[in-house]
Regions:
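Internal alpha-helical transmembrane segments of multipass membrane proteins
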Residues: 23, 321-342
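Short helix-to-coil transition segments within interhelical loops
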Residues: 11, 358-365, 443, 452-453
Length: 453
C-alpha cells in the first residue's frame, strides 16, 4: 500500500481546502523569511557602513542623530562645530586622519556634502577601500580659498545681523575670484537617478530635504567634474562639493556657535569658520576613549562611536522585528488550526473509505499515518513555497530599496533560522493532524461498513 498515493488522492479530492490551508502556511513562512532577510540585510549594511568611521565629532545633541547625518546622510545636522577644533584634531599626534563635512543643501533629494580632497585621497569607507572615480576627476581644493570663503560667509552674517538691528550697512568688498569654485563629484546612484553626466551643471536647493518652498541657488550652479564607482554605501547617494564653495553661497553664513567653549579652551584668535561634523581615524584604538572623553568634556562638541550607536539603534528596533516575527508565527498557528479543522470536517465523508481500507487489511497505525502524513505534507509544501516566496519578494523589492537607500539585501542568502522555520512547519503539521488521525485510528469498521438504512 503506497501511503503517498493515498495522501495525494485525498488532497486532490479536497483541492480547494488543501490550496487555502497550504497558502496560509506559505504566507506565514514567507512573511517570517522576509522579516529575517530584511533584518539581517539592513543590520549588516548599516554595520558595514560604519567600518571606515571610527569616531564622529559634531555639535552637542543626539549621538545617534550625528551618526545618521554624517555616516548615512540621514536626519539633519545637530549644528556646527569650530574649524579650529578640526585643525586641532588634524594636528593631534593620536589622529591618523580627520575629514570635515558640512551639509545644508540637496539636489532632487540627494544630500550635498561639503568636504576636502582628503575624503577622496585618504579616507577609507571600508578597510582597504577608498572612493574611486568611474569618470572625471576630483574637485580642486585649496585651504587658502577655504579661509577666504569663511571670511566672506562671516561678512555676510554680520551684514544680515546689522540689517536685522536696523543699522546702516556698509557693503563688504567683492571677494576675489576663486579658481574652480563650484565643482562637484557625484555618487553612482545620483548619476543613475538624476541623469547627471560629467561636465553637466546643476542647481542645488537649500535644505537637506526636497521642498517646493526651498530656495534654489540659481546664482551658483555646480559643475559635475567626477562620478564615483558604486560602493553600495551612503557614498553612492551623495554629492560631494569643495568645502569652500559651500560657504560661498547665500544661506550658509557663519554665525556664532550655539555654545561657548570652556574658559581654558578660549584664546584670542577668532574662529575662522565652522563645519557640521568631523570624521576621525586614530593611529591606534588605544587612543579612542581618551579622545572620546576629551571631546565630550567640551561644551561645544561631542564625540560618538558610529558602530556603538548603530548597535543601540538595532537594540531598539529589534523589538519591532520580534513583534513582526510573532505575527508571522501566529499566522502559521492559525494555518495549522485551519488544517486540523479542514481534515477533521472531511472525516465524516471518509469514514467509510477508512473502514474499507481496514477491511482490506490496513492496520490502525497505517490509517493513523495516512491522516497525519496528509497534514504534514500540506504544511511542508506550504512552507517550501513560502520559503522560496520570501526570497523572491525580497529580491523583487531590492530595486526599490536600492533607489531609496543605495544598498540591496542579499536575497539568495539562506539563513540558519530558515531551516528552523521549516522544522516548525513540520511539527505544526504533525500537531494539526494529530486530532483527526486519532479519530481515524478509532474508526469503527463494522458500523461504517454496514448499509445505511
Amino acid at each position: 500500500m503506497n501511503l503517498f498515493k493515498i495522501v495525494t488522492k485525498n488532497m486532490r479530492q479536497r483541492a480547494l481546502a488543501t490550496w487555502l490551508t497550504g497558502t496560509s502556511v506559505a504566507l506565514g513562512v514567507a512573511l517570517a523569511v522576509a522579516i529575517l532577510l530584511i533584518k539581517q540585510g539592513v543590520q549588516q549594511r548599516f554595520e558595514q557602513g560604519t567600518l571606515g568611521y571610527e569616531m564622529v565629532i559634531g555639535a552637542k545633541g543626539s549621538p545617534l542623530q550625528l551618526v545618521l547625518n554624517t555616516v548615512y546622510n540621514l536626519d539633519i545636522s545637530p549644528g556646527n562645530i569650530s574649524w579650529k577644533l578640526f585643525e586641532k584634531l588634524r594636528d593631534d599626534k593620536r589622529v591618523k586622519l580627520a575629514v570635515p563635512f558640512s551639509v545644508g543643501d540637496n539636489y532632487h533629494g540627494f544630500r550635498i556634502v561639503g568636504t576636502t580632497d582628503t575624503f577622496f585621497k585618504d579616507f577609507e569607507f571600508e578597510p582597504g577601500r577608498k572612493p574611486e572615480l568611474a569618470a572625471g576627476r576630483i574637485f580642486n581644493f585649496k585651504e587658502d580659498a577655504l579661509k577666504s570663503a569663511f571670511q566672506e560667509a562671516a561678512e555676510r552674517a554680520r551684514e544680515r545681523e546689522s540689517k536685522e538691528r536696523g543699522e546702516e550697512v556698509t557693503p563688504a568688498p567683492e571677494p576675489a575670484p576663486v579658481e574652480h569654485p563650484f565643482e562637484a563629484v557625484i555618487g553612482s546612484t545620483v548619476a543613475e537617478q538624476t541623469g547627471l553626466t560629467n561636465g553637466e551643471k546643476f542647481i542645488a536647493a537649500h535644505g537637506v530635504q526636497p521642498s517646493a518652498e526651498a530656495k534654489e541657488h540659481t546664482e551658483n550652479p555646480w559643475t559635475v567634474v567626477g562620478i564615483l564607482k558604486p560602493t553600495h554605501t551612503a557614498v553612492d547617494r551623495a554629492i560631494y562639493i569643495n568645502l569652500d564653495s559651500f560657504y560661498h553661497i547665500e544661506g550658509h553664513e557663519l554665525r556664532s556657535p550655539t555654545a561657548a567653549a570652556k574658559p581654558e579652551e578660549k584664546d584670542n584668535d577668532p574662529d575662522p569658520g565652522q563645519v557640521s561634523s568631523i570624521v576621525v581615524k586614530l593611529q591606534s584604538p588605544i587612543f579612542a576613549f581618551g579622545l572620546y572623553r576629551e571631546i565630550n568634556d567640551r561644551e561645544d562638541a561631542m564625540a560618538a562611536f558610529p558602530a556603538a550607536e548603530i548597535r543601540k539603534l538595532f537594540d531598539i528596533v529589534g523589538n519591532i522585528d520580534r513583534l513582526l516575527l510573532a505575527q508571522a508565527i501566529l499566522i502559521l498557528v492559525v494555518a495549522g488550526v485551519a488544517i486540523a479543522v479542514s481534515i477533521y470536517n472531511s472525516m465524516s465523508e471518509r469514514r467509510r473509505e477508512i473502514a474499507i481500507l481496514r477491511a482490506l487489511g490496513a492496520r490502525r497505525a497505517t490509517i493513523f499515518s495516512i491522516v497525519l502524513l496528509e497534514a504534514v505534507t500540506i504544511c511542508v509544501i506550504g512552507a517550501a513555497v513560502g520559503l522560496v516566496g520570501g526570497h523572491l519578494v525580497v529580491g523583487a523589492a531590492n530595486g526599490l530599496l536600492y533607489k531609496a537607500s543605495g544598498f540591496v539585501i542579499p536575497a539568495l542568502h539562506v539563513q540558519t533560522l530558515e531551516w528552523y522555520i521549516l522544522a516548525v512547519a513540520v511539527i505544526l503539521g504533525a500537531i494539526s493532524g494529530l486530532g483527526p488521525a486519532l479519530g481515524a485510528y478509532r474508526t469503527d469498521v463494522a458500523r461504517n461498513l454496514a448499509p445505511s438504512s
